[in-house]
Regions:
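His/Asp/Glu-rich metal-coordinating catalytic cores
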Residues: 232-273, 297
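Hydrophobic, lipid-facing residues on alpha-helical transmembrane segments of integral membrane proteins
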Residues: 99-114, 118, 122, 153, ...
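N-terminal start-of-chain detector that recognizes signal peptides
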Residues: 140-142, 246, 277, 320
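Juxtamembrane helix-boundary/capping and inter-helix hinge elements in multi-pass membrane proteins
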Residues: 176, 187-189, 241-245, 289-295, ...
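N-proximal short alpha-helices
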Residues: 87, 205, 252-253, 258, ...
């Protein structure tokens, strides 16, 4: 397509000459502004308008449609309505994309808490109608309901229902299919292959056992990234404790649970939860936002993944892990590696939580050894494959800097609403923790 990004200097249409261009455009078909990418195109050669046109001219200054009249000539804004600058148009486009996918997180929390409230209300009604006395309740129960079953109904099941609602919303809004995310991972080997006439020799894609080993290696490296986040979390916990403001990390222990309840809870933590979260964040959201640049999509979805955990301590771990998982998804064009990494990370944490230690010192030394081993694995992975990931974080878009894209995304109303919800939840949980520590 013959493209003229902008008309020549002095050929801008004036407010008094709507539909006319002076100078060098005489005798040629006039260039048309395309709101899809904020550029002008010359269709004097008979080329069709770019996608997104069609329809009649809109008086909305944010939209400039194509003229449906004879000859297929371009439509022009009325006097005084000049097309917005490309950067402004791109900012609006980014906000529209965020408004397309981010309400899924708001729906997730709304459905989750409404479902949890309904279940809690039903349990309260059941307890009220029960005729037992306090001494009749068996141990390890909540008014006769086993602790494991109570947690499943009020904590885990609402999250599953909320995440399922978010996935249905994203599926309807984006039009993407679940099978689109489970393609065979595309990974290039480190060894150069035959010369391909390019600047660098072609690298053969991995397949079979080599590809499976690479996915395992990347998953172990992802655990190393999580361990780096845990170091920051431990520093944060110690700092809060030193200033007299203790804050507890989430407790996923299953003490007092029946065997069936333990299996069901761990099934969500280790398998179902990672799969649903990867589909939401590294699947639908990342794929929709990636049209504005991989670096932008990776950073924005990782920050949302951090806020999604609604915990003051879980800041660096989900942020760093989310960035690594997003890079895996972008690099391999598949969710299989990121899902495997997420499952392995949660499974390892769950298994280690069941290992008894004779003292706190032994537990601390085991934790330090675990952190050192997996950080070493990550360092090895990055030395071998890091060069293939670094280009993904370089944003070379001439229309807008990465900071401008992130600013547009975080100022969209779904982002602001979600951040305010996060702040409110942190304030509430912090006050409850502080009151329970000092007054109970």
């Amino acid at each position: 397509m013959n493209r003229d990004p902008y008309p020549p200097p002095g050929d801008r249409q004036t407010s008094g000459q709507a539909g006319r261009w002076s100078g060098g455009w005489a005798g040629r078909q006039k260039p048309q502004y395309n709101p899809e990418d904020g550029r002008y195109y010359n269709h004097g050669t008979g080329q069709q308008p770019p996608p997104g046109g069609g329809g009649r001219f809109s008086r909305d200054p944010r939209e400039y449609g194509w003229n449906a009249g004879p000859g297929g000539g371009p439509g022009y804004p009325p006097p005084g309505m000049q097309p917005p600058a490309p950067e402004k148009q791109l900012r609006q486009t980014i906000k529209r994309t965020v408004k397309l996918v981010l309400p899924a997180l708001l729906i997730l929390f709304l459905v989750e808490y409404l479902f949890a409230f309904a279940v809690s209300f039903g349990i309260s009604a059941y307890i009220t109608q029960a005729s037992w006395s306090f001494t009749d309740y068996p141990p390890d129960t909540y008014f006769g309901i086993p602790y494991g079953l109570y947690d499943l109904l009020t904590s885990y099941l609402p999250v599953v229902v909320g995440e399922a609602a978010a996935l249905l919303f994203l599926r309807a809004r984006t039009g993407l299919r679940l099978k689109d995310f489970f393609a065979k991972p595309e990974v290039l080997s480190r060894e150069p292959g035959v010369e391909g006439g390019c600047r660098e020799p072609e690298r053969a894609p991995l397949s079979g056992g080599k590809l499976a080993l690479w996915v395992v290696f990347a998953s172990l490296a992802g655990i190393g990234v999580s361990m780096i986040g845990q170091i920051f979390a431990m520093v944060e916990l110690n700092f809060l404790y030193e200033i007299g403001f203790p804050y507890y990390s989430p407790d996923f222990s299953t003490g007092g649970y029946t065997l069936l309840d333990t299996i069901l809870c761990n099934l969500y933590i280790c398998v179902l939860g990672p799969v649903l979260e990867e589909l939401i964040f590294r699947g639908f959201m990342l794929r929709a936002l990636q049209r504005h640049g991989s670096a932008f999509a990776v950073i924005f979805t990782s920050v949302m993944f951090m806020l999604f955990h609604m915990n003051l301590v879980q800041l660096f771990t989900p942020l760093l892990t989310g960035m690594f998982l997003a890079l895996l998804a972008v690099k391999t064009r598949s969710l299989i590696p990121s899902i495997c990494c997420h499952i392995l990370n949660n499974t390892l944490s769950t298994v280690l939580s069941y290992i008894p230690f004779e003292s706190d010192f032994a537990a601390g030394m085991a934790t330090l050894a675990q952190i050192a081993v997996f950080i070493l694995i990550f360092a090895c992975f990055w030395m071998l494959w890091g060069r293939q990931f670094l280009p993904l974080m370089r944003d070379r878009d001439p229309a807008m800097k990465l900071s401008g894209k992130l600013g547009a995304a975080f100022t969209a109303w779904p982002s602001v609403t979600f951040i305010l919800i996060y702040i409110g939840m942190i304030i509430y949980s912090t006050l409850m923790t502080w009151l329970s520590y000092y007054y109970y």
